[in-house]
Regions:
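A structural signal for multi-pass alpha-helical bundles of membrane permease subunits
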Residues: 3-249
């Protein structure tokens, strides 16, 4: 019993230390965002002596941050819906409907994981420029969905492999079409995979900088990650208070 108690205590200590390490940057970010600029420069790691909301008032006064947040939300929401729909349906077809090219199609998606994002930037920029879709939400949604599909399809195929084929066959025998079988039976069972795919890619898409920095130059189309560059001055001077407040929001 004593060994079990000691083990539990050690486990709790480790968990508390882990939480402290994870939460400290968030706490520090909030404290830094409510410090005056002079105090933040003089003592960045000290507790705020005269907390102020001036940094938050500053970022909301020009209205830019709200536009950035709306653009990021719009792009993230549309991308996640497309990713979940396309990967769930493709995974179902690959897993449960065997045909001649099933293996090659699955290998094609698997190969997509190995393609670096960076090598596609110039070709996509040229393509978008010719199609006149630079500085649009579509220019960010398309690559986000494309690069998210390989891993998402693999996750859905892995889950569908645990669903008995007899369940699908019995539904078809009872008169369900493949579409009805997927919508009414298979997809509801995959809610855990849906949550995993949606939460994982929503973080990546919301924080995306490389695509936004390449394809977006107009102020009205900027996302949150790209809009934070606005707080960097012409000579590299950074308004850290406003930047931290924007990140906290």
């Amino acid at each position: 019993m004593a060994k079990k108690k000691i083990g539990k205590i050690v486990f709790l200590i480790v968990i508390c230390l882990f939480l402290a390490v994870q939460l400290y940057p968030v706490l520090w970010l909030f404290l830094a965002s409510i410090k005056p600029t002079t105090e933040l420069s003089a003592a960045p790691f000290a507790l705020p002596k005269s907390p102020t909301l001036a940094n938050y008032i500053k970022i909301f006064s020009d209205g830019k941050i709200l536009g950035y947040m709306w653009n990021s939300f719009k792009i993230t929401a549309v991308s996640i819906v497309l990713i979940v729909f396309l990967s769930a349906t493709a995974g179902f077809a690959i897993s449960k409907f065997r045909f001649k090219l099933t293996g090659r199609i699955y290998a094609f998606f698997t190969f997509g994981i190995m393609i670096p994002v960076q090598i596609t930037l110039i070709p996509l920029f040229i393509f978008y420029s010719r199609m006149h879709i630079l500085n649009t939400s579509f220019s960010l949604i398309l690559p986000q969905v494309g690069f998210a599909l390989p891993l998402s399809v693999m996750l859905f195929v892995s889950f569908y492999s645990f669903i008995p084929n007899e369940l699908i066959e019995s539904a078809i025998v009872d008169g369900c079409s493949p579409y009805r079988t997927f919508i009414s039976i298979v997809f509801p069972l995959a809610k855990n995979t849906v949550i995993t795919v949606a939460s994982m890619h929503s973080i990546f898409i919301w924080n995306d900088f490389i695509f936004a920095n390449t394809f977006i130059s107009e102020q009205a189309a900027k996302t949150v990650a790209l809009g934070l560059k606005d707080y960097v001055g012409a000579f590299g001077n950074v308004d850290w208070g406003a930047t931290y407040a924007a990140i906290a929001v």
